[in-house]
Amino acid sequence: MGYNNEFNYVDMHSSAWGLQVASQDPTQRSLRLFNSVLHNSGTQCLLATNAWVEAEGTEFSDAPEGVATFIAGKVRISQCTFANYYLFKAIKGANIVLFNQDEAGQFAPMDCSINNSISYGLGLDINDIASEKNIMGTNIYFHNVLFKSKGSDDTHFFNCVWEGDPKFKVNRDKYIFDYRLNNESHAIAKGDRSLCPKSARYDRFGNDRFARDGIDLGAYVWVAEPQAKNQ
């Protein structure tokens, strides 16, 4: 793929293999994803190997092998949504799959930071790198991330929302896969403004993350829905 590639406001649907990025030099940025959508892949939406990948305001959604896999490399994620309600196969992979190194140990260990984001759906939030045994001694960190699973903060997880529900506007029966937030979302105002890059101030729909005191987690700013009036 080369270096310094950028996907801005890209909407990639229904791919067989998703987007694949591999690099020999993780000190040079291979890919920046900005306010984009990688959705509905036959395998996984993103596979990055030993690459420097950045993503801001981006949705990774719906794939049977997990929506995003990172093997070693440098990973910087801010204001992203990892969601999986894939319909057509059983979901086998976690939403976020992280491998600190490749199996052969050729690559340097991963340098990963995931901030102000959401991991939610029918599969696991993260693969077993998240276990206390496996994550200790790594440079893998999560700040202000909403997880479906039960857990607690420690030296690699900071200010996270555990057993949360983002209340996506999803209706699988009607094939509606809208990963914006409903009024009751646990992701509302749970972010850290200092972790939101100025470049990510506006989401893909033009909504301002800084318009309210609290920063919402995930790719999309919560927009209040009118309350139904009693008849």
Regions found by a protein language model. Name each.
Residues M1-D11, V37, W52-G57, T69, ...:
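Bacterial Sec-dependent N-terminal signal peptides
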Residues M1-S61:
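Right-handed parallel beta-helix
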